[in-house]
Amino acid sequence: MASPDWGYDGENGPEHWGKLYPIANGNNQSPIDIKTSETKRDPSLKPLSVSYNPATAKEIVNVGHSFHVNFEDSDNRSVLKGGPLSESYRLRQFHFHWGITDDCGSEHLVDGAKFSAELHLVHWNSAKYPSFADAASQADGLALIGVLVKVGQANPNLQKVLDALKAVKNKNKKAPFTNFDPSVLLPPSLDYWAYSGSLTHPPLHESVTWIIFKETISVSSEQLAQFRSLLANAEGDREVHIKQNNRPPQPLNGRTVKASF
């Protein structure tokens, strides 16, 4: 849950996170601006294998700064393998990041360009660690897929998620969300960039192998507006909309961004 000590604007916004979470100023923070001319094609990168079982979809939860769609992760029915990963990583949840307007919602940038939103699919190293909580702070603990989202055509594959938001309008609300394969939200091409980074909000652990797809997906402006209709407050409290939840890009600090293509 979002603790009240951090947020996305004012005195608990991203530029102040370092006071309570010193790793915010670490050398391997995310997101980054991917400068395509400085990425290196790595022929040793394997193709990605994404295998999600719709039966593992479990619930949707308003966490106060976004919504999470959570998956049953007690077995290997929904896993990410290959690419830059040497082990099998289990799907835990997916969520989106968005901005106040349609032109600035992504966390990762490409050659300085912002996108409308960004989808993150969160996986943990189930080959080495017993649980997500154990993996989350380990250097090889997490693997996140990032999908950049552009406003354009409506995305029919997102509709089931949007329809479920009504049931979780307020912080801490949860509702069943079953029979969904999130691979329908991925772009047709799985060409990707990969680099070592961090969670993009507190606790900001530098434990993430990032896999960012080159190809974008589209959503309509109306669909994106439904994300902003979610409330950051618990029921009965003063209404505060989740208007934005994206961290600005962080310094690369000499890290290499590999390309699969």
From Swiss-Prot:
Reaction(s) this enzyme catalyzes, per UniProt: hydrogencarbonate + H(+) = CO2 + H2O; urea = cyanamide + H2O
Residues reported to bind Zn(2+): 95, 97, 120
Cofactor(s) demanded: Zn(2+)
Active site: 65
Record-listed E.C. numbers: 4.2.1.1, 4.2.1.69
Residue positions where N-acetylalanine is found in the record: 2
Activity regulation annotation text: Inhibited by acetazolamide.
Location within or outside the cell: Cytoplasm
Gene3D superfamilies registered for this protein in UniProt: Alpha carbonic anhydrase
Residue sites binding substrate per the record: 200-201
Chain's role: Catalyzes the reversible hydration of carbon dioxide. Can hydrate cyanamide to urea.
Name used for this protein in its record: Carbonic anhydrase 1
Organism of derivation: Bos taurus
Lineage: Eukaryota, Metazoa, Chordata, Craniata, Vertebrata
